[in-house]
């Protein structure tokens, strides 16, 4: 029996290409196009593996993976993304994923990664792994620096969800409907988020969402008033 797989990507052509690569060896049971649909698909199918893009709408891939790992701890997760930056890689493995593959990889690498992850190993694309090694080597050869304090932003998972939806241009009413709470609750969350981040306007909140990796800069829409 073929292992069951979910492919989560908001770009249909990308998802279809990945499905084509996997279909000979895996049973692709769902191709959700946003983070919330991914969570529902995992709860419905309980697949062996999910391949997840980071830049998913409504709920980004990393936060969706947090939900998925809580509801289905046995699932294996591979991030499939264009983001090779170290902070994305670090956050992905903090979330609990087992693999990190770049979309620039060849089909053979993707198949190898899925097999490695399903047999209990961790897989990172060589380009990403080499980047992490290079950064570690650079850090080890640099003279010690006096650490400079940086502000720590600690948003709850729900606050991150609200911030992403604000940055995607959703109105308070739309956000409330999406996460199934009242508009007053959304107003409360936005006020707390603004206070935590030290910002006041929607544009500033959007910039913070980009900084936190909740949305990609190219995906920032016109805001809804």
Whereabouts are the PLM-identified features?
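Two-component/phosphorelay signaling modules centered on CheY-like receiver
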Residues: 12-30
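Acidic catalytic/metal-coordinating carboxylates
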Residues: 34, 60-63
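Short, flexible helix-to-coil linker/hinge segments that flank and couple to helix-turn-helix
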Residues: 88-94, 98-99, 104-157, 161, ...
């Amino acid at each position: 029996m073929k292992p069951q797989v979910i492919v989560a990507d908001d770009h249909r052509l990308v998802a279809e290409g990945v499905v084509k690569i996997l279909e000979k060896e895996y049973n692709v049971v769902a191709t959700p196009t946003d983070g919330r649909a991914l969570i529902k698909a995992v709860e419905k199918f309980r697949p062996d593996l999910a391949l997840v893009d980071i830049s998913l709408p409504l709920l980004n891939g990393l936060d969706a993976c947090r939900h998925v790992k809580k509801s289905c701890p046995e699932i294996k997760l591979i991030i499939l993304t264009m983001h090779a930056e170290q902070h994305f890689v670090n956050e992905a493995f903090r979330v609990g994923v087992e693999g990190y593959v770049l979309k620039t990889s060849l089909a053979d690498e993707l198949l190898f990664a899925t097999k490695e992850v399903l047999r209990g190993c961790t897989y990172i694309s060589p380009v990403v792994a080499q980047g992490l090694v290079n950064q570690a080597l650079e850090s080890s050869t640099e003279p010690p620096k006096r650490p400079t304090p940086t502000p720590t932003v600690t948003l709850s998972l729900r606050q991150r969800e609200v911030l992403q939806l604000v940055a995607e241009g959703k109105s308070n009413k739309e956000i409330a409907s999406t996460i199934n709470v009242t508009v007053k609750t959304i107003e409360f969350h936005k006020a707390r988020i603004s206070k935590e981040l030290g910002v006041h306007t929607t544009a500033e909140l959007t910039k913070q969402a980009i900084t936190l990796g909740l949305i990609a800069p190219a995906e920032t829409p016109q805001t809804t008033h």
